[in-house]
Amino acid sequence: MEYTYQYSWIIPFIPLPVPMLIGVGLLLFPTATKNLRRMWAFPSIFLLSIVMILSVYLSIQQINRSFIYQYVWSWTINNDFSFEFGHLIDPLTSIMLILITTVGILVLFYSDNYMSHDQGYLRFFAYMSFFNTSMLGLVTSSNLIQIYIFWELVGMCSYLLIGFWFTRPSAATACQKAFVTNRVGDFGLLLGILGLYWITGSFEFRDLFQILNNLIYNNEVPFLFLTLCYFLLFAGAVAKSAQFPLHVWLPDAMEGPTPISALIHAATMVAAGIFLVARLLPLFIIIPYIMNFISLIGIITVLLGATLALAQKDIKRGLAYSTMSQLGYMMLALGMGSYRAALFHLITHAYSKALLFLGSGSIIHSMEAIVGYSPDKSQNMVLMGGLKKHVPITKTAFLVGTLSLCGIPPLACFWSKDEILNDSWLYSPIFAIIACSTAGLTAFYMFRIYLLTFEGHFNVHFQNYNGQKSSSCYSISLWGKEVPKTIKNHFCLLSLLTMNNNERASFFSNKTYQIDGNGKNRIRPFITITNFVTKNTFSYPHESDNTMLFSMVILVLFTLFVGVVGIPFAFNQEEIHLDILSKLLNPSINLLHPNSNNSVDWYEFVTNASFSVSIAFFGIFIASFLYKPIYSSLQNLNLLNSFSKRGSNRILGDRIRNGIYDWSYNRGYIDAFYTISLTQGIRGLAELIHFLDRRLIDGITNGFGLTSFFFGEGIKYVGGGRISSYLLLYYSLY
């Protein structure tokens, strides 16, 4: 067992051979590597599976032995400075390792089929494997320098994957936006790390905790400077986990392939910020102002993410704002000191959100056969509807993920979210009211997504929903280059509703985009499973292939049962705290709260749970009332669906609803504010500086030059070499 811990430093580097071999193969043997490209799914999954097995073994040892292991190598540069690097295995590391590997394996398995048609298949798997390597290195780091190195690698991989289809202008803009926004947080993180080193002289977590505790206890540290360092450290987590006000990159990150969205939102990039705050919580907890600030940012993000998700029409953007809101719950829990609740929600949310994103990928995959490779069509919920008849397995999986995120028992997110809500009442009643209200909003917007996607009629030819007569279609196989074919516009909705099934089928089949030699229907996936029966048709959306469905089914099982790890099994006060998660987190909980009592009053738990579940069902009821097909008007798919027109003068309630809808659909006008105040402000400042440089600075120097030139030209004629002219000038002056 000792050898397992000692050599666990190799864990982050196990997936690394895949991107290295792909790169070498493309350089030395490009033709053979491209011809055998489908084989790279197997080594990617196999190597990550080895990491998963090691992670499970380490977690079992953590549960049984309850200790923290750290192995450090010292690199002495001179007598005054030595850099120590190594790896740290503790409960937080074990949880993150299992989370990254399990979600990563399922996403890779899913991606083999999802990306089979894409010319960038090899590039995709190289990026994905390096992404996993970077995240594994981040969670096993034993000091702040290592964390910063892998932190930057995670950001680089996310930049590459968000802009995977880089010839698509929106994708290129999105990856730049994510990169620049995260640079703000990363710069703050770097300054915070350097500030802590200036105070303590160490980057190691164990030294930081001990030295800072002693310095603060003896009042030997400048309090304001230390608080500033903590704020800067937290800024890195704010940007990476898409917390307000650095959240603007997250919805635009949906321009990348859907499997990337699943991995980023479940177990890698956005989880990195939560991991950093959890890792540094022993530092933050010393200063109450920092904890209050963390909880404040968390509760603002909870509410903002939920309100911005209310009116999104893009299915992936709606899920992105959902992720933002749920990350706010985790940050709120950390700010309240609820370490266990935050990590519990990180676990349950990861599997539920991965399921939802892979489900949305299956929906998009099926819609592309009808509307072509156009994100503004294949991801638009207004063009969906009635898909439960065509993609029943995807519908069931998506419903399970939706119910879990809504907090419906006994699904995974119910247990963790309810624990956060209970702790919030003890921390601040105002925060608790906001958190509980947001739980109702979560149920509303999640069921809105479900109802618009799976219930009602298939609205693929319902055009002009946003006032646009046409939109561009893109070919993923060409990395975003526009294709010449377009879907017929100005199609009447009434004819769609009145035509019979045969007419509908023939109409859709005539407008189907056929896929070329690289198409999905002509390439068999490297991994084939025959457990499910799917019906392929191009008249209506069809169920995804079995490889994609397999990953979704496994995530359904996780969503159903992963909540068990945090549920107390015994009902007496002596053993009530001996659930699996508490056993695993026992060393960390004792470090943060030496006299903590994890006992649970089941009567109080049931009472609070009944309240939160009632709020969730109320949100579901409102969503059903507004978006259920029997009440909905297909001509106005927004918050005004169920309200009849009352003449030209709308009442105040209509204006309020319109205002809420506009606020949500336009992202709270935060992006517009940043564009005006920052982007245009910086450009205006640059133009002003350019004007001053060209006109003022250059004008002064050029003016001196011109003055000297004309002065020289003037006196040149005076000194022409004639003595008579010199005498005349002399006598005229004197």
From Swiss-Prot:
Keywords per UniProt: Chloroplast, Membrane, NAD, NADP, Plastid, Plastoquinone, Quinone, Thylakoid, Translocase, Transmembrane, Transmembrane helix, Transport
TM region positions: 9-29, 40-60, 89-109, 125-145, 147-167, 185-205, 219-239, 258-278, 280-300, 327-347, 354-374, 396-416, 425-445, 549-569, 605-625
Assembly and binders: NDH is composed of at least 16 different subunits, 5 of which are encoded in the nucleus.
Source organism: Eucalyptus globulus subsp. globulus (Tasmanian blue gum)
GO biological-process terms attached to the record: ATP synthesis coupled electron transport; electron transport coupled proton transport
Keyword set includes NADP: yes
Cellular-component GO terms for this entry: chloroplast thylakoid membrane
Reaction(s) catalysed (UniProt annotation): a plastoquinone + NADH + (n+1) H(+)(in) = a plastoquinol + NAD(+) + n H(+)(out); a plastoquinone + NADPH + (n+1) H(+)(in) = a plastoquinol + NADP(+) + n H(+)(out)
Function per UniProt: NDH shuttles electrons from NAD(P)H:plastoquinone, via FMN and iron-sulfur (Fe-S) centers, to quinones in the photosynthetic chain and possibly in a chloroplast respiratory chain. The immediate electron acceptor for the enzyme in this species is believed to be plastoquinone. Couples the redox reaction to proton translocation, and thus conserves the redox energy in a proton gradient.
EC number(s) given by UniProt: 7.1.1.-
Protein name from the UniProt record: NAD(P)H-quinone oxidoreductase subunit 5, chloroplastic
Subcellular location: Plastid, Chloroplast thylakoid membrane
MF (Gene Ontology): NADH dehydrogenase (ubiquinone) activity; quinone binding
Recorded family membership: Belongs to the complex I subunit 5 family.
The organism's place on the tree of life at top rank: Eukaryota
